[in-house]
Amino acid sequence: MAKGEGNVLAQHKKARHDYHIVETVEAGIVLTGTEIKSVRAARIQLKDGFAQIKNGEAWLVNVHIAPFEQGNIWNADPERTRKLLLKKREIQHLADELKGTGMTLVPLKVYLKDGFAKVLIGLAKGKHDYDKRESIKRREQDRDIRRVMKSVNRR
């Protein structure tokens, strides 16, 4: 876990399988009161989510935050678009990277840091099927090598 990263509430585990993560950026999320209560209860799904930049602002799209059970009329739409809090320089850098390169912004994890909800956004390029097979093959080979080295070291 990176320095300052507190309690991880949600992870997009398949993101590293489906994408080559080039760079990561930490961003704050603008949430309503009932949404932060649901996030603290770890009722958030990042699976279909992505981030986009519109008019110089970063937005988190398709991230599902379940309605808070005691929220009643104050609950917001679970799939609403949420604003990300980034510095203007960071937004400009990400916008430059996204222009015409086949890159996308993918939420990797949501966690609490000093009481605030943060999202780790990855600048990613999609993997092809053969890239995924290569990753699996490489992981299996590394596992076999570790297994053999472990048995050799025991002798």
Swiss-Prot record:
Gene Ontology cellular-component annotations: cytosol
GO molecular function, one term: RNA binding
Keywords: Cytoplasm, RNA-binding
Keyword Membrane: no
InterPro entries: SmpB, SsrA-bd_prot, SsrA-bd_prot_CS
Disulfide bonds: none
SUPFAM superfamilies on file: Small protein B (SmpB) (SSF74982)
PANTHER family in UniProt: SSRA-BINDING PROTEIN (PTHR30308:SF2), TMRNA-BINDING COMPONENT OF TRANS-TRANSLATION TAGGING COMPLEX (PTHR30308)
Cross-referenced HAMAP family: SmpB (MF_00023)
Function comment: Required for rescue of stalled ribosomes mediated by trans-translation. Binds to transfer-messenger RNA (tmRNA), required for stable association of tmRNA with ribosomes. tmRNA and SmpB together mimic tRNA shape, replacing the anticodon stem-loop with SmpB. tmRNA is encoded by the ssrA gene; the 2 termini fold to resemble tRNA(Ala) and it encodes a 'tag peptide', a short internal open reading frame. During trans-translation Ala-aminoacylated tmRNA acts like a tRNA, entering the A-site of stalled ribosomes, displacing the stalled mRNA.
Assigned protein family: Belongs to the SmpB family.
Protein name: SsrA-binding protein
Species of provenance: Streptococcus equi subsp. zooepidemicus (strain H70)
